[in-house]
């Protein structure tokens, strides 16, 4: 059965973090201003199409529910290799001498004339296998997204990271410090101001996640490889968008709902300490009586004042003091003709989702959630995505919202 979208896998042998084709003057393909990327010429052709030899694709991206933060997106692409092109010691290979770690790989899907990136990352491992009794070997190309680059880049001081700048400006300063490409950023202006950079030894990823936490926003790498920083306001209001409906009668069909009803995500006591400040405590007494104490403690936040730290503690507890039945994940099969392919390919973090599930007794469970993870499994005969779904990571009151605009229920954010 043909897949509902045309899948392509491109492999870029050029160095650097930027995805794209190098600009080549006079070339019909690479000589387009605004399309080609300024880069040194390479041999072999910098970007090659691996699609004809791809056997399977596995992509894992999303927010870790228990750690409450985004993690590096990973991908494993299995490529059949009948001519041993991916053998790094094969001098006859056109890739000889260029097959190194941290080259760029992208997975895209094209549907109805529109292309969607499903993954953009950097190779970290080549697992070559020659199965016994088979004539054709294969290589598993293992990739991580730009979080890997940021985790490897240690920093002490950050240039231009002065007191009073907003968290979005601080995120940009950290990315500048590690020379992350400016054309691969989408940075909101922060709602919170920062202390001067503390000058401690840490990874750039730790510094970026600290800024996002101090904002109570989000920092992640999207499917096109862009570093995205969402401020608190946009994180909150994203939950009020018109949701995509998934159900068993007219909406997008699904399977394998993962239900949970437990205390794992409850936080009813939070202590937040900024750099140079004192611990600020917020608690929900009713939640503590009901569920016992569930505590969290964060230190060295870069929020500028103790009042900011207290607000972080308050909104963190307000968002997590209660629990209810959860839908943590669902699987959608794109081979099902009732599934709108373009809609599923366009999902990204913070997309609003409304899931309705009919129970055997005729009752229903209805949850309005957000997409916070996408796991793709693609072969010549399969195209499925498992969607991680979560309640909003930061609650707040939004006027005219049926979900976030309920007086007496919705959280008044700062």
Task: Write out the residue ranges for each language-model feature.
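Assembly/oligomerization scaffold segments
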Residues: 1-165, 195-216, 221-223, 251-255, ...
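Acidic, small/polar-enriched beta strand-loop surface segments
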Residues: 1-51, 160-168, 206-372, 376-381, ...
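Helix-boundary capping/turn motifs
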Residues: 72, 183, 346-347
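Secondary-structure boundary/capping motif
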Residues: 76-78, 239, 386
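Short beta-strand-alpha-helix junction that forms the catalytic/metal-binding core
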Residues: 141-142, 385-388
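Fold-independent oxyanion-binding glycine-rich loops
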Residues: 146, 187, 232
